[in-house]
A protein has these predicted regions:
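Bacterial Sec-dependent N-terminal signal peptides
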Residues: 1-25
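Boundary/junction segments of secreted and surface-exposed precursor proteins
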Residues: 18-38
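Extracellular/luminal low-complexity Ser/Thr/Pro-rich, glycosylation-prone repeat/linker regions
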Residues: 20-25, 146-163
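Hydrophobic beta-strand residues in large extracellular and virion-surface proteins
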Residues: 26, 40-46, 60-62, 125-131, ...
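A short, structured loop/turn motif at beta-sheet edges
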Residues: 31-38, 66, 129-140
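Low-complexity, serine/threonine/proline/glycine-rich extracellular segments that form mucin-like
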Residues: 36-83
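A surface/secretory-pathway sequence property marking extracellular, secreted
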Residues: 66-106
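Low-complexity, intrinsically disordered segments enriched in Ser/Thr together with acidic residues
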Residues: 99-141, 147-149
Length: 163
């Protein structure tokens, strides 16, 4: 009989400086513990992104522990009052400056491809993941990293670049 998997750790982490992000929330439906084959929906909201030195939000990367499989996007982040463009789900992207990204959503700015969106948020998104088949407890960690256009190489005057 398969053992019930447990969450080794669950973390919604961010690479953007805490002075750039605020009002985060997340839910997992259903709540754990999980067994192989369980499908979990994650809803995440970043309430506000305040870029320093005109630093704009550019991407949300989703990092999963080895116990998850079948990452599927459901709800794309909005772009309230932001730059012309759209959010694109991408499994892997290398930005012109060499920064590797993915999987997750990245903003495609139609006015300047190297820039993110000028929107301050809120940014709400959701995705589904499945507990992988296994007989032993596996790492079911989840983290969401927020990247700005300074980190991705499209802008070079930001206070959050080195985070």
């Amino acid at each position: 009989m398969r053992k019930v998997l447990f969450i080794l750790f669950l973390l919604i982490g961010l690479t953007a400086s805490s002075q750039c992000i605020s009002n985060q929330s997340s839910t997992l439906i259903p709540a754990g513990p999980y067994q192989p084959g369980d499908v979990v929906t994650i809803n995440y909201t970043l309430g506000d992104f305040t870029g320093i030195n005109v630093n704009w939000i550019h991407a949300f990367q989703i990092n999963l522990g080895v116990g998850w499989t079948n990452l599927t996007p459901i709800l794309t982040p909005g772009n309230p009052f932001g730059s012309a463009g759209f959010w694109l789900w991408d499994l892997q992207n290398t930005y012109p400056g060499g920064f590797n990204f993915g999987p997750g959503w990245r903003f495609v700015n139609t006015g300047n491809a190297g820039w993110g969106t000028s929107s301050d948020g809120p940014f709400t998104m959701s995705f589904q993941i499945t507990v992988a088949p296994t007989c032993t407890p596996d790492n079911l960690s989840i983290s969401i990293e927020v990247f700005d256009d300074c980190l991705t190489g499209g802008w070079s005057n930001g206070g959050c670049c080195n985070d």
